Amino acid sequence: MNTRFLLLLCCLSFTAFSQPFDALKQPNRSEEEVTQLAEDFKDWSKASNDWRYSFITANEKEAVEDFSISGYQTANDYLRATDTSTWGVAGADARQYIRTVKSALNKLPKYKGTTYRGTWVKQSLLNKLEEGDVLVEPAFTSTSTLPEVAKRFSVVHPNSPQRLKRVLFKVKVNQGGHTIAGLSEYSKEAEVLFAPNAHFRITQIERTSNHTYIGVETVKASAAKNTQKYNLYSGEEVEASFWHSLVCT
């Protein structure tokens, strides 16, 4: 790891701040600075491609490019659906697309460090969460090395009958994160993507009137045994049978 990238990580991750969520609470940096940091991350992503990248196919590249535009919607809708039996041909297409994106991720650079995610989560789930609990995301999980980008995704309240609250995640990436900045159509997002069924252990929670800040770290499924687990999307407790299927697939 060269000196330039170490300096870049310091800038991206706001490591100079002493409090866990300072990077998410500080005023946004200028658009020019954020754009430059995203370009630097894109350059690093391309430079970090190893021998695996030589095996990436044209279909896989196209799938990742499409994922950042609109493909994520179909893929994640399918992965989060409680019943996919009615999807028909669209379901078969979705499954093939998901397999292609997952295959591409395995050939893209791994990322370890800090990322951020902004989203909306059911209030009923937030009321139950405690430090040490594990969140399981059945869909792909998009994060960014730039807190400014993460915050943009939690501005507009989704159209949902559920009571939702804005949540900003700080993610310590130990495993499972792959940068798609070198392929994504939205390279300015400095995106780090996780495959379906990523596991995030809660390390810190800070609740305010407008936001909930949650610090998490990625963990292996096998390391989350005997731990309270929740489906991040549905808010439901992950039961043993479902948990077993995640471990075995």
Segment roles from a protein language model:
Residues 2-8:
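Sec-dependent signal peptide recognition
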Residues 8-9, 246:
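Secreted/extracellular small peptides and ectodomain modules produced from precursors
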Residues 9-11, 195:
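A broadly tuned, weak detector of single residues within folded domains
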Residues 13-15:
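N-terminal signal peptide c-region/cleavage motif recognized by signal peptidases
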Residues 19-249:
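Mono-ADP-ribosyltransferase
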